[in-house]
């Protein structure tokens, strides 16, 4: 049988899809492109925004149109959070939540015997571990991504992720160290640590991200350890001092802000003020000037006034960030913010997104100009294409050795 996969949303989903692909291949299935005719289509859904829901449904419709006789399986975060909504779609044959994603192949084979529509979703908050760590390794070319943690213990008022991914579960430190050593032996120079909320790594184990990093930097052969998104209130002084002083830790940090208005930050239950956020950003940039700081911003949060938005704009304009991801607010199931009123009209949200996207382009250009004339470490990710330690993607002739870490003049 032929099986095709479509992955929506974050890298967590990409990890999970790769795990599923391997299981299907081992069972003798032929994995084909989502654009091809297949007997089974697996859509790994996203629900972080209304747009994620919409894109997930569109993928489901596309699959059934491509082959009306195919079995369509909806899994992932949308399936976990709102399974009955997906089950109502005539195009969907199976709904499998994140709790049972690792058993999807077995559930599918049971379906093949009975051909009865089924919803298989468990209680996400009962999940106690990250499953199948040995295969939770995803590659973007020569850059391996390790999922070291899953879930989030912080229930921000706008965010559905804890309901989709559960509470914090961390991979044992020894397993991660072993995996990174294997990657070093294979010649990889950079490794990316990722998770739902990386700064919560180890909370369920009695240790933390600092502990993990102090072990990983000892591994010979790995020259760059890149970190995914972190929350500034989960970064203690030990961790901050380490990331600005240790050369092996890539000077590229994604620190979600969400709003530059203290009133909105409080409504979001983010746990910090813009002044506290600025203090962390300034500490990093002052102590490691080449650092790239990325962030996330939500516009149009319920009750956000023009004054709130202007505070956000002026704050982002002032602080030394290098790029931002901008999202229009959308109500999510189970969240406190979904009950907040008044809601902002779509046209206002779109306009605020547009304004911040213009600022984002200026920030990216400013960061590039700031780095001109500097010699930086960079990984050759494709022939004549490099990614610098501080996340500048550049094209330069004469670099043929893919996977090699070099020094390059910007």
UniProtKB/Swiss-Prot annotation:
Coiled coil: none annotated. Its EC number is 2.8.4.5. It is found in: Cytoplasm. Residues 1-113 form the MTTase N-terminal domain. [4Fe-4S] cluster 1 binds at residues 10, 46, 77. It holds the Pfam family Radical_SAM. Gene3D superfamilies: Methylthiotransferase, N-terminal domain, tm_1862 like domain. The lineage of its organism: Bacteria, Pseudomonadati, Aquificota, Aquificia, Aquificales. One of its GO terms (cellular component) is cytoplasm. It is an enzyme of class 2 (transferase). It catalyses: N(6)-L-threonylcarbamoyladenosine(37) in tRNA + (sulfur carrier)-SH + AH2 + 2 S-adenosyl-L-methionine = 2-methylsulfanyl-N(6)-L-threonylcarbamoyladenosine(37) in tRNA + (sulfur carrier)-H + 5'-deoxyadenosine + L-methionine + A + S-adenosyl-L-homocysteine + 2 H(+). InterPro entries: Elp3/MiaA/NifB-like_rSAM, Methylthiotransferase, Methylthiotransferase_CS, Methylthiotransferase_N, Methylthiotransferase_N_sf, MiaB-like_bact, rSAM, rSAM_horseshoe. It comes from the Bacteria. Keywords: 4Fe-4S, Cytoplasm, Iron, Iron-sulfur, Metal-binding, S-adenosyl-L-methionine, Transferase, tRNA processing. Its main location: cytoplasm. Belongs to the methylthiotransferase family. MtaB subfamily. Binds 2 [4Fe-4S] clusters. One cluster is coordinated with 3 cysteines and an exchangeable S-adenosyl-L-methionine. SUPFAM superfamilies: Radical SAM enzymes. GO terms for biological process: tRNA methylthiolation. Residues 138-366 form the Radical SAM core domain. Its cofactor is [4Fe-4S] cluster. PANTHER family: RADICAL SAM PROTEINS, THREONYLCARBAMOYLADENOSINE TRNA METHYLTHIOTRANSFERASE. One of its GO terms (molecular function) is metal ion binding. [4Fe-4S] cluster 2 binds at residues 152, 156, 159. SMART domains: Elp3 (SM00729). It comes from Aquifex aeolicus (strain VF5). Catalyzes the methylthiolation of N6-threonylcarbamoyladenosine (t(6)A), leading to the formation of 2-methylthio-N6-threonylcarbamoyladenosine (ms(2)t(6)A) at position 37 in tRNAs that read codons beginning with adenine. This is Threonylcarbamoyladenosine tRNA methylthiotransferase MtaB.
